[in-house]
């Protein structure tokens, strides 16, 4: 009896988008000044084809929308901005196309802590768990979602984080 033909695998671009739950909890001490006065914080959410470029760009690139688009080039699929106020909890379902393999998050802090203002996640890994991020005085933390590439710190905790 002849073997049944194998069903071809569906290419990523034909699969339905992923639904990723994104939660950002802003602390009461959000984006603080040297006098510990809290301020609003802009958080940018990126849908990316690749994340290596995103991980290497310096902070100031993300402050300039045009420069950011030029530097991320073809890696960038979409970027959204959310403005948070101290104590706010923000939650939404994000549709992530299959061509976006990564989700990046940047907190545009007044004085960001070294290496604590940017996070990236593999979209496939956070489809089930979602992403929960804490936004604090000068740093981001992660409550849910597996982070890619953290440089010598545990993204779940603020210990040893120094605001400038």
PLM-predicted stretches and their roles:
Residues 16-20:
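Short structural boundary motif marking the start of a folded domain
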Residues 1-14:
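Bacterial Sec signal peptide processing site at the extreme N-terminus
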Residues 10-12, 31, 82:
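Outer-membrane beta-barrel proteins
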Residues 14, 35-37:
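A generic structural micro-feature
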Residues 118-164:
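Glycine-rich, aromatic-bearing surface loops/beta-hairpins
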Residues 38, 45-115:
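Mid-length scaffold segments of soluble, non-membrane domains
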Residues 22-34:
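Short amphipathic, basic-aromatic surface patches that mediate peripheral association
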Residues 21-22, 114-122:
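Gly-Asp-aromatic-enriched flexible segments
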């Amino acid at each position: 009896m002849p073997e049944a033909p194998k069903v071809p695998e569906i290419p990523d671009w034909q699969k339905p988008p992923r639904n990723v739950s994104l939660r950002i909890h802003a602390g009461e001490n959000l984006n603080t000044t040297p006098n510990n006065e809290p301020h609003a914080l802009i958080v940018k959410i990126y849908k990316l084809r690749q994340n290596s470029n995103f991980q290497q760009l310096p902070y100031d690139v993300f402050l300039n929308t045009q420069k950011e688009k030029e530097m991320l080039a073809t890696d960038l699929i979409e970027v959204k901005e959310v403005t948070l106020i101290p104590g706010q909890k923000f939650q939404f379902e994000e549709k992530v196309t299959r061509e976006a393999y990564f989700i990046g998050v940047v907190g545009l802090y007044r004085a960001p802590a070294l290496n604590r203002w940017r996070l990236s996640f593999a979209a496939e890994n956070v489809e089930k768990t979602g992403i929960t991020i804490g936004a604090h005085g000068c740093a981001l933390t992660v409550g849910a979602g597996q982070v890619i590439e953290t440089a010598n710190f545990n993204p779940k905790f603020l210990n040893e984080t120094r605001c400038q």
